[in-house]
A protein has these predicted regions:
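Active-site-proximal cap/lid insertion segments
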Residues: 1-214
Length: 214
């Protein structure tokens, strides 16, 4: 997708360098399924072993440090129905962390390719003359993966099929690859909506509706 976008930019600049151009670049990321090359997934091995509760705290602290949220902001409580990370078995932690590693890899890979597109604009000499609007999504992070996550979001979301931990462990190395249509646990979705509560499916809370824009 990025390569085609770059070719389009180069073609427009070659044919009519004085003419403005418009591009709508819309990746599937971070909508499920979360897919990424294996080497990108490997970069995040162990990065989420601390779990979703600690991840919320770390994200919240970083948001304050970067001025994304006011200094007096208070972190919302873990929403009802989301288990505390410290109460989970080792197998559950392993599976849940894997889903998040894959999600992070998919997001990073998308960002990398957006960077390639911006570099192409820069090479035309028009970067400072270009308006770039970056919208991160159309809703909050999604809870459709259920508590366990899933390797087949369509079966889970549309038909109510759930996958137990033993099955997910058997699919561990396939998660994020072409044989899966994976989605992470709704607890990770909640963590990704920090500092707000809830997720895409709960529009009464900002966790379901707020999105970043640059």
């Amino acid at each position: 997708m990025a390569t085609r976008a770059i070719n389009y930019i180069n073609k427009q600049n070659s044919l009519a360098p004085e003419k403005p151009f418009f591009m709508y670049y819309c990746t599937g990321t971070a909508h499920a399924p979360h897919h990424a090359p294996k080497d990108w997934i490997a970069k995040y091995k162990g990065k989420f072993d601390q779990g979703w509760d600690k991840q919320r705290e770390e994200t919240f602290a970083r948001q304050k440090a970067q001025g994304v949220i006011p200094e007096n902001t208070k972190l919302t409580q873990r929403s009802d129905g989301i288990p505390a990370w410290d109460t989970l078995s080792a197998d559950r932690k392993k599976v849940y962390a894997r889903f998040m590693e894959v999600y992070a890899a998919a997001l990073s890979y998308a960002d990398y390719n957006i960077g390639r597109v911006l570099e192409a604009v820069e090479k035309t000499g028009e970067l400072d003359n270009t308006i770039i609007i970056y919208i991160m999504g159309d809703n909050g992070a999604s809870a459709e993966g259920t508590v366990n996550g899933t390797t087949n979001e369509i079966a889970t979301a549309a038909n109510g099929v759930t996958e137990d931990i033993s099955y997910l462990l058997s699919q561990y190395d396939k998660i994020g690859g072409p044989e899966t249509y994976n989605h992470y646990s709704y607890a990770w979705a909640h963590a990704m909506n920090t500092p707000f509560q809830w997720t895409k499916q709960v529009a009464s809370h900002f966790g379901g509706t707020r999105n970043g824009m640059v």
